[in-house]
Amino acid sequence: MTSLGLYIHIPFCRSRCDYCGFYSIGRKPTDRYIDALIKEMDLKSPDFEDRLCDTVYLGGGTPSSLSEAQLTRLMKALSQHFRISDAAEITMEMNPCDMSESYLKNAMRAGVNRISIGVQEKHDHLLSAIGRRHTAKEAETAVKRAYRMGFHNLSLDLMYELPGQTVKDFEASLRWAVHLPVNHMSIYSLILEDGTRMAQLAERGRLARPSEEESWAMYQAMCRILPAYGFERYEISSFARKGYRSRHNQKYWELSDYLGLGPAACSRIGRTRTENTPGVRLYEKELLTGHPPQQEVETLSDIDEMEEYCFLHLRMKEGLPLDGFRKRYGEDITHWYGDAVKMLKEKKLLKEDAGHLFLTYHGAALGNFVFEQFLQD
């Protein structure tokens, strides 16, 4: 039987970042919410009793907004309901402000062995501009403290194309980050999500963002600096030193099975994709009165899955295996995407080598355009 990934959504934040489009609410987690999560485990875990969970990911929101007691209780419940591998990668997203020595000790005792830290930038004026609560010094102290206490699988999130950010700012952030004791970085360009404060400012013409030339220079800096310090780009937004790829995120890109718990959490089992409806109060009410959470359910068609197979594999360093596509869908990729592949090769956005299709250097920079070519009308 294939392995299973677990995702647990902790949709609480002390304050909402100006760019964030994820479902979250501005208050501390309650014990009632942990009660509801455990009820969801009660309902769903029997269907997975023969599956070995080799990755667990606590995402948000801000999972480190959980109290030490709440985190301990949650992790204990997971181990009681699911078969967690002794070698499982257990990741928890943390805000630098929450990473006290006491909190880190408790997280380690609870089973967390990988921390993803939302750093975003090294310049305090830019952190303030995007609504982050921590300073660069607090982030650096938190990272070094976690490493000193035995967390050697640490990941940083960084962002570029921020309002007011210069190429020199981003280069300085990269050079600062590579000298921290981390082995993984996720680097994202700013996307203006509908309904966020930043999107509203942009609509009013009050958001000064880097030019296209500056954005391209930032992209080039990322691709130049990180490999020079041993960080391999193994996915379009992800860089890791050898042996430190995110095993949980690879499940998403490889179309593997994962189960999501919590409001707005997504699951994918085979070709069935489900999403719990957002709303903490509704989620708690349903589960604490003995009902499953309301869900949206979608069964992927052959075409839907084929599209995902193409653009998710193209995100990764290993690329899209042409023989794997043929075996999975019964036809060469040219049967479905011949014109698109030809056009993308001519534009030097795709290349073919050793039976795989890969994004080129420029193709990775224009990833969304490339991926759109694999969507059927």
Model-derived features: positions:
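Conserved N-terminal Rossmann-fold NAD(P)-binding element of oxidoreductases
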Residues: 8
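Short amphipathic alpha-helical interaction segments
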Residues: 331-343
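C-terminal scaffold of the Radical SAM
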Residues: 3, 24-47, 51-331
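Minor-groove-contacting beta-hairpin "wing" of winged helix-turn-helix DNA-binding domains
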Residues: 356-360
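Short, amphipathic alpha-helical interaction segments positioned at domain boundaries
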Residues: 364-377
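Flexible, acidic/Gly-rich N-terminal and inter-domain linker regions that tether
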Residues: 1-4, 15
